[in-house]
Amino acid sequence: MGLRTPAGASRGGSFFARVWDVSAGDGGPPGRNVRAGFTSLANTYIIRGRIYTWRTIMIKNKFMALTLTVVLTAGMLTGCGSGDKAKDKDAYRQYGINCIENGSYDDAVDAFQKALDQSVGSVGAEELDICYYKAKAQYLSGDVDGAIDTYTAIIDYNKDSDAYYLRGCIYFAKNDSDKGLKDFKTALSENNDNYELYLGVYETLSKYGMNDQGKEYLDNALKLKAKTADDYMQRGRIYTMLGDYDSAIKSLKKAIDEKLVKANYYMGEVYQKKGDNDSSQKYFKKYLDSGEADSYDLMNMGQAQMDNGTYDTAITYFQNALEL
């Protein structure tokens, strides 16, 4: 059908919004971490007698959505005719997403398969999007081979770079670095101007003790010419990983000057690494005040403050995360 990009997976890296860190034992925050190095669900903080965890955030934010979806799904799927397959597909998809976010991975796999069953053989952007979710649920449920098969089916259909990359991550998790490297190489050959793809490859390789080889990918990414504010932001992230904080600040400033709010978050991280907590807080606050920060960003900012020993500020971030 000539489709190259699944729904929600526009070039430039936004597909990371729906995938996860396969190298983390628990999968990482749902819908956030495709790369190693981010905060995982295992992080738990006890401050003044209160427990803050990724799971706390997930349950608070998603419990009502899951309950509502269960009710809607039950109502829609018990009395619908053949003309309601599109509604059924959307209901199963949403139910599957909520199951993932609440740790019911087997139920999620079943829901996504039922969503696909409503398509009656047609394959479009929505079906590919559901396949990505299904592969995620399969991996998290422990069905690693099933996840590989699902990514392979996507690759057979349209050779999408996202699927190559994610399958490569799973091969690394299976200790099959040769196949993983092959998939990473193919992913970049299909989409060689995606900064986040280079970042993802680096962090996965670094996670598995191949840091020097990973840095080669970062060096290659820096050979690309920045064209957009997002490009400058991603270059800033790369310079940060390479320890070149001055260049990181310069690139991130360009992104901020072009009104890319998210760049404030990464600027805060740079100053955190430089030990300049005042500047770090200034940029974190700008990002927080923008209203664009989500629960996972706030938890990461809280973790940074925990690492820095500024517990009162950490509590503020954690509490703000709970309120979203």
Can you say where each PLM-predicted feature lies in the sequence?
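Canonical tetratricopeptide repeat
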Residues: 94, 126-129, 133, 140, ...
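C-terminal motif of bacterial Sec signal peptides marking the signal peptidase cleavage site
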Residues: 75-79
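Start-of-helix register in tetratricopeptide repeats
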Residues: 90, 124-129, 162, 196, ...
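Register position in tetratricopeptide repeats
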Residues: 101-102, 140, 173-174, 207-208, ...
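Structural marker of alpha-solenoid helical repeat scaffolds
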Residues: 118, 122, 156-157, 190, ...
